[in-house]
Amino acid sequence: MRQRSVRISALALAVTAAMGASAFAPPAHAVRSPHAAQSTPGHEATRSALRDLVEKGGQPGVAAKTSDSRGSWYGAAGYADTATGRERSPGDHFRGASITKTFIATVLLQLEAEGRLSLDDTVETWLPGLVRGNGYDGSRITLRRLLNHTSGIANYTADPEFVHNAAGPGFPEHRYDTHTPEELVAIALKYPPQPDPEKAPSYSNTNFVIAGMVVEKATGHSYAQEVTRRIVRPLKLRGTSFPGTSPQMPDPHPVAYSRFHQDAPDAEIHDATEQNMTWLGAAGDIISTTGDLNRFQRALIRGELLPPAQMEEMLDEVPSGDGTGYGLGVEFAQLSCGVKVVGKSGRTNGSLSAMVGTQDGKHQLTFNVNGDWLQDGSLYVNAIEAEFCGKTPLSTRQPSRALPDSLPDSFATRPGSGD
């Protein structure tokens, strides 16, 4: 039987590896009660998949919202705060991590439609000297190749020292550090380019850090200002923001629980809610809500944000294997029932998210888990399968390392993974 490509290498989570802070161990009841907090009737398969993320996956809580021809549905399980028993709520703000990339790509495509740049422009044209040396030549890398991960530029979040500080034992000391885009690109360029990137896409956060720099160079404004002006305000995404150096989260929000990517079942759990997201910047600093992301996804796919020519460019798929592929700031996955979905996933410290929809723009799902140690990747994918297929496949267990190994976002490798 064909395994549903859900080693969803593309559409499954931004693996930005977890950060943690002050020691905080949730009480045992945190994952014992998979009740559906404030869930509304319907979507039984999805409801069951959410409960499984808490009950079988050991996650603190999960919240999801869907939108289709029948209207909107909200479902949740577990807790926003395991210490107080506060449940997840429809208005919860969370860190969407690499879902940011879809917003950045949309802005660049809008700029192309306005004649202010071309995606066939090179990095060297816009940012002279930035990508040069150690086998790199920015005059041969186009903006398009940044957005579909065929640039070959190394992923700075695979650097061992960076991982140590951003995701491991160094996090408590470094959680409030501010990073510049130039610093992040310089880390990446210490490593040689990926071979034949146009034949085999290689996911790299560095691509979108550079893309954010191009937005700033082309407009004279930060990527956050441009996304806010062009997308957030017109769509009235009132729960969406780009925090910059601020480590705070707007209320309401769940506690973001992290295990520092320690695999031991009894690994200590930490509160990673506060963090300075300049370590991802244009590659992943968005804060949003399930409702906002559904609205954005629907407007985008229905062509409300881009002209037809740019929409076609965004959805031009570069296959990455097993029924998955990359567009420009979006990813594709073929589900077990034959439905092909498009969207983006995101994972950062204490937060796992997905923004997924059908390619006709008629059906959307966004969900967020406020924990980051899910070892059984099939439980995550089952939430997508349940919503768009109405059921989950018979196979429900991926290898214990399936999640980090199969997902290319943010941290392509983990400390000690050897990948």
Ranges and model annotations:
Residues 50, 70, 101-104, 108, ...:
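Residue-level preference for non-acidic, small/hydrophobic
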Residues 19-27:
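C-terminal segment of classical bacterial N-terminal signal peptides
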Residues 2-5, 26-75, 268-419:
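Catalytic loop of the DD-peptidase/beta-lactamase superfamily, centered on the K-T-G motif
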Residues 135-341:
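Short, surface-exposed loop or secondary-structure junction motifs
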Residues 65-67, 97-98, 102-118, 206-217, ...:
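Primarily hydrophobic membrane-targeting regions of prokaryotic envelope proteins
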Residues 1-15:
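N-terminal export and membrane-targeting signals
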Residues 57-60, 84-145, 195-204, 281:
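Short active-site loop at a secondary-structure junction
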